[in-house]
Amino acid sequence: MALPGTELYAQLLYEQPMLTKSLTSSTLFGFSDLLAQLSEQPRSDSTALVNREINARRVTRFMICGLGSGVCWHLWYGVAQGWTDALIPYGSLDPNGQALANTALGIVLEQFVMCPVYFSLYLLPVVSLQSGIPLSDIPNEIRKKLPDLLVQNAKVWTPANVVIYNVPIEWRCLASNTVDV
């Protein structure tokens, strides 16, 4: 038996895959920031959860960033699957070897192709602009932040990607966004 909402979400993925993934990413980016803001505030017995202040503009910025991120990752997972299928044709290995090779190649491609492109051309520029950094300073921001970001990304995402690259392609954005939270 499917979880409540799973069938509807699967139908939306089938009918409007990019829109569904983009809106999902936006929602979960916003939710992640909401959780972060709640965890940043001091907790005391006298402070009820409903009395905590939330920076709605910040949540909105995260959600806007998530819209584009959903599109980027939707496109990436399709490209990565195409490259993986071309480089490791189905049936060329036993089923376990096929799964292992596909997962490893997906992770390598993501770390060395997608992440440098995504961080340099989307995430860092968008976050920088949202933070008020002038457009002319963005190349310096990328040069300054990209190397450490790629190293930290590999540390966090390599284990998660072992699972993500074994999820059906339609569901990978949701799986990835869930790890983001």
Indicate where each model-derived feature is located.
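Transit-peptide-like, low-complexity N-terminal presequences
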Residues: M1-Q11, S44-L49
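Short linear motifs at secondary-structure transitions and domain/linker junctions
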Residues: G5, P95-N96, T103-A104
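Short juxtamembrane and helix-loop transition motifs at transmembrane-helix boundaries
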Residues: L135-R143
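Helix-boundary and loop/linker segments of multi-pass membrane transporters
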Residues: A10-E15, N51-A56, S92-A99, P139
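Transmembrane helix-loop-helix
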Residues: S46-T47, A86-D94
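Short, intrinsically disordered/low-complexity patches at protein termini
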Residues: R43-S44, I138
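Alpha-helical transmembrane segments of eukaryotic organelle membrane transporters
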Residues: E15-P42, N55-I88, A99-S131, K145-V181
